[in-house]
Amino acid sequence: MELILKNNVKEARTEMGLSQSQLAEMVGVSRNTISSIETGQFSPTAKLALVICIALDKKFEELFYFD
């Protein structure tokens, strides 16, 4: 059974009133990368996932989970 990393990044981002571009700038990636993470097309590295958690003021387990 393959585990797939899912996330709540979009929900947390919109809850904070941030656009994809704003979050991307905060974490040092492109807007396209944020979009790809939100849609599940790209799984972030552990480092990038942690930076996103810090930017969105969330714990890792609040944003990322395996399905």
What are these regions (language model features)?
Residues 9, 23-24, 34-37, 63:
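Conserved hydrophobic/aromatic packing and binding residues within compact polymer-binding modules
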Residues 47-62:
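DNA major-groove recognition helix of helix-turn-helix/homeodomain DNA-binding modules
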Residues 29-42:
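Recognition helix of helix-turn-helix/homeodomain-like DNA-binding domains
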Residues 3, 14-15, 43:
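Short amphipathic helical patch at the helix-1/turn junction of helix-turn-helix
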Residues 7-26, 51:
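Short basic helix-loop element that most often maps to the first helix and adjoining turn
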Residues 1-3, 21, 59:
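N-terminal flexible/basic segments that precede or flank functional cores
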Residues 3, 65-67:
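Short, charged recognition helix plus adjacent turn
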